[in-house]
Amino acid sequence: EYDEIYIMIADAQALTDNAENPGKVRDNIIEVALDYLSCGLDPAKSTLFIQSQVPELTELSFYYMNLVTVARLQRNPTVKSEIQMRKFENSIPVGFFTYPISQASDITAFKATTVPVGEDQEPMIEQTREIVRKFNSVYGDTLVEPEILLPDNKACLRLPGIDGKAKMSKSLGNCIYLSDTPEDVRKKVMSMYTDPNHIQVSDPGQVEGNCVFTYLDAFCKEEHFERYLPDYKNLDELKEHYKRGGLGDVKVKKFLNNVLQEELEPIRARRAELEKDIPAIFDILKAGSEKAQAKAAQTLHEVKDAMRINYFDDAELIQKQAEKYSK
């Protein structure tokens, strides 16, 4: 459907709340790249790149900052939620506070028409759209206003962490990682948050807000019941039994574990093969970063041209100044 696909590893953004631990960010770059590639990303069809290796993004952010007020950033629901989650309170790093502007640069630099995100990122995309409209109204049509692309499966809009308290996040340590061993996955699934009032098997259970059922909504298919839980035809039947009582959390968690293990097994196998040639992964990232930089440089050139700050390329400006000072 898309002529070009750019996928960014946001190491510079990660530094906004890891400035004192750059080694952590550095080490995670290869982990993220392995995750993307093991899930099937084809570098021949998509451009995988590292944010910090495209300095044009930083320059674009600097220009966009003049189009956004502090008050507008403070009203961004995603920013407010992230600040609360990280307990920054009155010590918010400036880089973190302004990351919606940085994200606007990440999107507009590649003339993106579509941005696939979870629902929690909708305010960020809307802020990008505002920046695009503001820039174009001041300097003329230059930037592309992107559309948001949400998952068809509503359960995938925002997967909660296994603790049930927030979205799944590496920084919060409530994730199931693609690199986890089968035993790691099993332990995490068996420790998942469910309904705290579902104490005995006979107790009626709550499905809404129950992590286990949220993950089943996201990953479970009818054929899984044939293989792992033949007493039920589909997920609706399982939910109804849980809600009326008589179905224990352990049984449901064991089923989810089987579902996730089946989903993750081919990913783990591909990852194991990719790990055998790490220099090749860096080659992919280098080639992708070079391609991304070329694209971003073109957009930056157009932005500076629209703003009339392309001094050395502006023959008319040079001529006018020459005439002014020759009198």
Regions found by a protein language model. Name each.
Residues 58-62, 99-102, 122-125, 209-213, ...:
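Non-catalytic, well-ordered alpha-helical scaffold segments
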Residues 15-18, 109-113, 167-168:
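Active-site-proximal beta-alpha loop/turn segments in soluble metabolic enzymes
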Residues 1-105, 223, 262-264, 268, ...:
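N-terminal Rossmann-like or analogous alpha/beta NTP/dinucleotide-binding catalytic cores
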Residues 77-81, 85-135, 139, 160-161:
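Internal, conserved structured core segments that host functional sites
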Residues 54, 69, 75-78, 84, ...:
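Short capping/connector residues at structural and topological boundaries
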Residues 23-30, 122-125, 282:
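Non-membrane alpha-helical structural segments and their capping/turn regions in soluble enzymes
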Residues 129-327:
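Conserved nucleotide- and phosphate/pyrophosphate-binding catalytic cores
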